[in-house]
């Protein structure tokens, strides 16, 4: 069965439009990763840029350095996981298999 090059190009144009729309949607994503019962919260966008770091100062003085560093790491990893999940949800069924 021969493939019509014009049909292929039309499909590629559609794929490009889908990718452009997905990029716009991803740029709108904002998530908040949290750790230590909200002692540390990190806001991140869909491009994995940290937009805000919040620290509940009420608990800050009671933490040692290692515990505080671990909470920051956990909150950051939580935010990254949430961005990845949002991207997965927004791209599911939109891109052709394997992209």
Swiss-Prot record:
GO cellular component: bacterial nucleoid; cytoplasm
Pfam family, one: YbaB_DNA_bd
InterPro entries reported for this sequence: YbaB-like_sf, YbaB/EbfC
Taxonomic superkingdom: Bacteria
Entry keyword set: Cytoplasm, DNA-binding
Subcellular localization(s) per the UniProt record: Cytoplasm, Nucleoid
GO molecular function terms attached to this record: DNA binding
The keyword Cytoplasm belongs to this UniProt entry's keyword annotation: yes
Subunit structure and binding partners: Homodimer.
Described purpose of this protein according to its UniProt entry: Binds to DNA and alters its conformation. May be involved in regulation of gene expression, nucleoid organization and DNA protection.
Family: Belongs to the YbaB/EbfC family.
HAMAP family xref list: DNA_YbaB_EbfC
NCBIfam families, alphabetized: DNA_YbaB_EbfC (TIGR00103)
Protein name: Nucleoid-associated protein EbfC
Organism name: Borreliella burgdorferi (strain ZS7)
Highest classification ranks of the organism: Bacteria, Pseudomonadati, Spirochaetota, Spirochaetia, Spirochaetales
